[in-house]
Amino acid sequence: MAPCVHPCQSCRLRALEAFTPVTPQELDFIQAFRNGTTTVAAGGAIIQEQKPNGKLFTLYAGWAFRYKTLQDGRRQILNFLLPGDLVGLQQQFADGAMHGVEAITDVQLCVFARDGLWDLYRAHPSLGYDLTWLAARGEGMVDDNLVTTGRRNAAE
C-alpha cells in the first residue's frame, strides 16, 4: 500500500459542499484511522464479491461502480461512485462483500481498517452519526431505484 500522500488536514474533498465540518480532534482521529492510500487501475477490482478484505475506502479520485453478479454470470450495476463516496461499509455487517466494486477510471482511494470503525463510533459519535446518515441515504436511493424499476411508468 502506498504511503499517505496527502494529509487529511489538506484533503481537497473536505472543501466540497457535501462534507460537514469536523473538529480538530475529529480530523486527528480520521488521520490516525487512515492506513494510507492505494490506487487501482481502470477495470481493476476494489472489492470482490463474497470476499472479506477488512478495509473501508474513501474514493479520493476517479470513478467506480458497485455491481452484483447474477447466477448466470450477468452483472447488474447497482450505482456509480464518485470522489468522496465511502466504499465498503456494507461489509461491516456481512461475511464478505455482498457486491463488487470496480474502477471505471484509474482511482485513488484512502484506506481505513474496518476493525477501527467501532472506535470511531465510541470516540466521535458525531462522525458515527455521519456514517449512519450516509448508510440511510444510500438505502433511500436503493428504495427509489426499486420503485422506479418496479412501478413507475416512463413519464414518472
What are these regions (language model features)?
Residues 122, 126-156:
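Polybasic "coupling" helices that flank or enter modular domains
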Residues 86, 117-118:
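A generic structural signal for short hydrophobic patches within well-formed alpha-helices
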Residues 43-47, 147-150:
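Short, solvent-exposed loop/turn elements at beta->coil junctions and helix N-caps
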Residues 1-42, 86-87, 92, 123:
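Cyclic nucleotide-binding regulatory module and flanking cytosolic helices
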Residues 18, 44-106:
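Cyclic nucleotide-binding regulatory domains
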